[in-house]
Amino acid sequence: MGFSGQTLAKQAPKGVVGVWAFGPYFCPLHHRFNLSNFFIMEHKGHPPLNLHWDRSGLGAVQNVYWNLGPAELVETALASGEGQLCDNGALASDTGEFTGRSPKDRFVVKDAITENTVWWGDINIPFSADDFDALYDRVAAYLGGKTVYARDAYACADPAHRLNIRVITELAYSNLFCYNLFLRPTAEELSKADEPEWTILCAPGFRAVPERDKTRQHNFAILNFTRKVILIGGTGYTGEMKKGIFGVLNFVLPHNKNVLSMHCSANSGSEGDTALFFGLSGTGKTTLSADPQRRLIGDDEHGWSDQSIFNFEGGCYAKCINLTPEKEPEIWKAIRFGSIVENVVFKEGTREVDYDNGSKTENTRCAYPIHYIDNALVPSVGRHPKHLFFLTADAFGVLPPISRLNEAQAMYHFISGYTAKVAGTEVGVTEPQTTFSACFGRAFLPLHPGRYAALLGQKMKEHQVQVWLVNTGWTGGPYGVGSRMKLSYTRAMITAALQGELDSVPSHAHPLFGVSVPATCPGVPEEILNPRLTWSDPAAYDAKASQLAAAFIKNFDQYRDGVDAKVLEGEPRP
C-alpha cells in the first residue's frame, strides 16, 4: 500500500514517539505487524508534550526532529550537505536558484476573511482556497517518507500580542534560520506549548506545475488566513518565511487589534527614549539604528500598540555585502557559531568569507539571534517613541539632509516611501531611478497603505511624536556629479534631533516640498543643510527638484482615493 499527503497521523500514546503507518491507516507501536511496507514515523529531538501533529496533514513523513538547538542543526546541515562551516564558526549555505524573495509568486488565499479586506493587486495576488488545499496535499505527499524539522516559536515580544508559530521545514538550515529569526520559547514554555496559531510549511525541493497548481511558475509563497498556514515551495530563500509572518502580522495587528505594524528598526536611549528608523534597502536603516550609545530593540519589523513599541522578531537578517568590522562592528561580531551566512563566497583556499564578492548575488545575508548583538534590549520592548526618522537615499541630490515634517507631511511621505536606485544596484540600472514603496514596505502590506498611515497619524497625535525626513543619499548634485552624504554628518544630525538640539534653531520651508529645514546643526557645515546651496548651478537644482516633486505626485495618484484629505496637504507644490 502507498501513502498520500492526505494521510493524518494519530498521536502516539504517552511516552511513545513513533507510529506505524501505511496508507491512511495507523497502528500504535505496540501493534507490530510484520509488513514490509510499514514504516515508523518517529518524533525525535525535543517534542512538546502536546504535538497536535494530526492537524498538519503530514502523517506520512518518516522522521520529525523537534526543536533542535543550533549545534544539532548545524551538525545535521553539514552532514546533509546543506552548507559549510566558516572559519568564524558560522554556517555558510546557498539558497539555490533564488537569492531573494520572488514578489510575483506571492499569493493570498481569497476567502471570507480576505475578500473585502485585502488590498488586491500585483502585491497581494489572489489564490483560490480549493487550489491551496490541493497544493498543500501535494506538498505533504512530496514530504512522505522524508525527514522534516519542526520548531515551535513565536512572533511579537510584547506578550499581549504574542503569535505562536509552528515551522516545519524540509531542510535543517531553514530551521536554524527560524531559530535565529523568530522568538524562542523557554524550555518550560515548550513543555506546555499549546496548539500553534500559525504554521509555516517550507519545502524548497517541491516544484509546482503551474498548469496543475495554478501558480505562476514552480516556486510559490502563499498565505491562507482561514487555515492559518504559510505554504512555501520551490525556493530555498529563507527570507520568504520571515516575510510571510510579517505579512500575517501586517494584516492581523492593524485589522484586528488597531496596532500599527511597521517595517522599521528601533533603538532606545539611556533614558528609555525610543526612536524608529524607516527606510528601504540601502538607506542606512540598519547602520543608523546600530548606535553604541543606544540599545537595539530590533532591526526590521516592529509593532506600535497602546502600551509599547515591540519587536516582531528574535533575531536579525542583515545584508553583509562589503561588510567590514570598521563599518558594522556589531554585525561583524554577530557572525559566529550559530549564525548563518547566505550565498557568500570564500576567499580562495580558505573558509574565510569574502564579503566583497557579490558573484552569487549582491543580496548576501547573515542571520543571527538578537542576543548576539552586545547592546540588544531583551526583551525587545520599548516605550512610545518621541522621534521617527524616514530615511531616503535620494540619488538626485534634491532633498535636504534633514528636515522636520508636520503630521500631513509625515503621513504623505510614509505612504510614498521614497528612495532611489543607482547604477549597479540592479541589472539594467544605468542612471538614478525613483523608487516608491508604500509605508517603506509595500511588498508586505495586505491592507491599503492608507490604513497604516491613518494609524501613524493617530499615534503621532497621541504621543506628540516628531518625524524627520533624512536624506542619506547625494549632496552637491545628483549621482555621478555630487557625492554621498558623509555618514558622520548623518549621525550628527540624528543625534542632534534626538537630543533636542534642533528644536529651537532657525529653519525655512523648502520651496517645493514644504518641509522645515534647520539652518544649523552641531557637527555639520551649514552649507550642507541647504541642498540648493551645494549645487554649482542653482537653476539645475530647481529643475531637478521640480522633476522629483512631479514624480511624488504621479506616484501618489494610486492612493488618493483611499486616504484622508488631510494627507494631501503634505504633497509637494511644484
Question: Which stretches of residues belong to each language-model region?
Answer:
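A short glycine-rich, hydrophobically flanked beta-strand micro-motif that places a catalytic Asp/Glu
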Residues: R151, V259-A266
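Short, low-complexity intrinsically disordered segments enriched in small and basic residues
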Residues: G2-K14, G18-H30, N34
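N-terminal accessory targeting/assembly segments
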Residues: M41-K192
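Generic C-terminus detector
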Residues: I528, L533-P574
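Conserved lysine of the Walker
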Residues: K285
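Charged, amphipathic alpha-helical linker segments immediately N-terminal to NTP-binding catalytic cores
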Residues: D213-V252
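Hydrophobic positions on the alpha1 helix immediately C-terminal to the Walker A/P-loop
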Residues: L288
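Glycine-rich, often acidic-flanked micro-motifs
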Residues: E42-D87, H263-L280, D291-P292, G303-T534, ...
